[in-house]
C-alpha cells in the first residue's frame, strides 16, 4: 500500500470514524480533494488542472498526518496543558509585579487551536474528501459553532479572569459571518469576557497588529498566546520562510516569558510561506 493511501485510511478511521466509508474506498482517487471548487479560474488547460490537483492532494495528505497527531496524540494534549501552565505562571508573576500597575493588565489570545480545538471538524472534512482548510471553508466550519475547548483552556481563562486581568480574543475569524456564532460558542464553552469589546475578529485587515496596538493603548499586555507567528506583535505577516525564522530568532527571549506558542502542524501561515496561494 502506498504511504499516501495509508495516510488517508488512518485519518478517516481515526478522524472521521464510520461517517465516510466511501471516502476510504476512493482514497487513491483525485476526487479525494474536491479540486473543482478550488481550482482558480485562470487555470485553463487540463494539464495545468491535473498538476494543481496533484499538488493540492499531496499537501492535503501531508497535513492529514499533522492533524492526526493533533487529534489523537497524548503529546499534543500535554503540550496544551504545558502552554497553559506556563501562561498561568506568567500571569501570576505579572499580577504580583508592581511595575505592571501603571495600566490595567491584559492578555491577548488567538482563538483557533489556541483556546478552541477544531480538529474534529477538520477530521470530518478530510474524511468527506476535503483537505484544504482555506478561508471559505473556515467561515463555513466555525459558523456551525461546534468548536471544542482546548485542554486546559476553560480553567486557565477563568482563573485569569479571577485575577482581574482583561482577556482579549484576537482572531482572524471573519466578523461579518462568524461573530455571532463565535460569541455563542465561546459562551457555551464557559469562556469569560465574551463580548464585543473583548472578541476582536477580522473585519477589513487580517493583520492583527492594528488590533494589538489598540489594546496596548489602554492596557499593559503581559502575555500573547497563539499557534501562528502572526498571533504575536512581531511583524511576520507576508514574510518569506527565511524572514519569518529570522524574526523569531530576533525575539527568542520573548518566548516563554511574554509569548506562549501552541503547536499546529496542520495549517497556518507557514503553509502559505511554502506554497503561495494555498492557504491564507
Residue ranges and their predicted role:
Residues 95-106, 167-172, 194-198:
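Surface-exposed patches in mature extracellular/periplasmic domains of secreted proteins
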Residues 90-97, 122, 156-166, 185-192, ...:
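Structured segments of extracytoplasmic/periplasmic soluble domains
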Residues 106-110, 116-117, 166-171, 200, ...:
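Structural recognition of the beta-strand scaffold that forms the well-ordered cores
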Residues 69-80, 139-147, 168-175, 200-202:
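Second-shell loop/turn segments in exported
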Residues 113, 153-186:
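Substrate-recognition element of Asp-dependent hydrolases with the DxDx(T/V) motif
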Residues 28-33, 38, 42, 74, ...:
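C-terminal cap/substrate-recognition subdomain and adjoining C-terminal extension
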Residues 2-5, 12-14, 18-109, 273-280:
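Non-catalytic pre-domain segments flanking phosphatase-related domains
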Residues 97-104, 115-147:
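Active-site neighborhood of HAD-like aspartate-dependent phosphohydrolases
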Amino acid at each position: 500500500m502506498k504511504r499516501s493511501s495509508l495516510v488517508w485510511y488512518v485519518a478517516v478511521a481515526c478522524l472521521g470514524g464510520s461517517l465516510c466509508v466511501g471516502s476510504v474506498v476512493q482514497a487513491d482517487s483525485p476526487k479525494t480533494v474536491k479540486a473543482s471548487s478550488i481550482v482558480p479560474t485562470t487555470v485553463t488547460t487540463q494539464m495545468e488542472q491535473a498538476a494543481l490537483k496533484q499538488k493540492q492532494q499531496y499537501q492535503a495528505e501531508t497535513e492529514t498526518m499533522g492533524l492526526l497527531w493533533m487529534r489523537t496524540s497524548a503529546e499534543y494534549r500535554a503540550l496544551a496543558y504545558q502552554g497553559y501552565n506556563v501562561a498561568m505562571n506568567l500571569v501570576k508573576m505579572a499580577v504580583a509585579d508592581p511595575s505592571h500597575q501603571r495600566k490595567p493588565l491584559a492578555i491577548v489570545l488567538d482563538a483557533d487551536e489556541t483556546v478552541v480545538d477544531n480538529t474534529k471538524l477538520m477530521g470530518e472534512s478530510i474524511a468527506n474528501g476535503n483537505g484544504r482548510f482555506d478561508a471559505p471553508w473556515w467561515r463555513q466550519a466555525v459558523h456551525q459553532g461546534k468548536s471544542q475547548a482546548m485542554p486546559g483552556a476553560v480553567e486557565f481563562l477563568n482563573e485569569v479572569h479571577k485575577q482581574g486581568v482583561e482577556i482579549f480574543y484576537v482572531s482572524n475569524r471573519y466578523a461579518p459571518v462568524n461573530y455571532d456564532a463565535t460569541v455563542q460558542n465561546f459562551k457555551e464553552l464557559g469562556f469569560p469576557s465574551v463580548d464585543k469589546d473583548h472578541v476582536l475578529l477580522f473585519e477589513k485587515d487580517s493583520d492583527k497588529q492594528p488590533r494589538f496596538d489598540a489594546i496596548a493603548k489602554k492596557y499593559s499586555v503581559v502575555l500573547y498566546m497563539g499557534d501562528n507567528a502572526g498571533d504575536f506583535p512581531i511583524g511576520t505577516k507576508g514574510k518569506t520562510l527565511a524572514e519569518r525564522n529570522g524574526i523569531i530568532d530576533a525575539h527568542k527571549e520573548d518566548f516563554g516569558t511574554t509569548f506562549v506558542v501552541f503547536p499546529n502542524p496542520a495549517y497556518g501561515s507557514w503553509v502559505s510561506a511554502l506554497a503561495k496561494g494555498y492557504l491564507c
